Amino acid sequence: MADPWTVEAHRLFKKHGIKTVGYVPDAGLTDLINACDADNDIKAVVMTTEEEGIGLSSGAWLGGEKAAVLMQSSGVGNTVNAIASIVSSCQFPLFMIVTMRGQYGESNPWQIPMGQATAPVLRSLGVRVYEVDTEEDAAGAIENGLKMAF
């Protein structure tokens, strides 16, 4: 059974007209990725690097569609130049769901530096960040993020 937050996220994608979802495979996003992949109204696009999601999202917008990008916090660093040069300069909307690593209790020390830097880096690029501490808070953050982005 899918996590309740991912069921709600998929419902919100449909409600807000998300037609393209780019993702780098991640265990924390598996249920949402699978829901999008099974949905004939959503183009689910597996990416080889997170940076591709910025171009995918921007291209979808230019083509008249809304997109979402899904990734783990360790991949956010790969998106910095694309966000700064494409999204910020062209004022394209950007909606991302980023699962966090490197937080309290992280067992992999390699995840800690980017996990701690993710929100400040995104904010420094002008990206509005909604941080979620519990699954129950995810739907509200996703809904607000979609409204702000589009």
Predicted region positions:
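Thiamine diphosphate
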Residues: 1-150
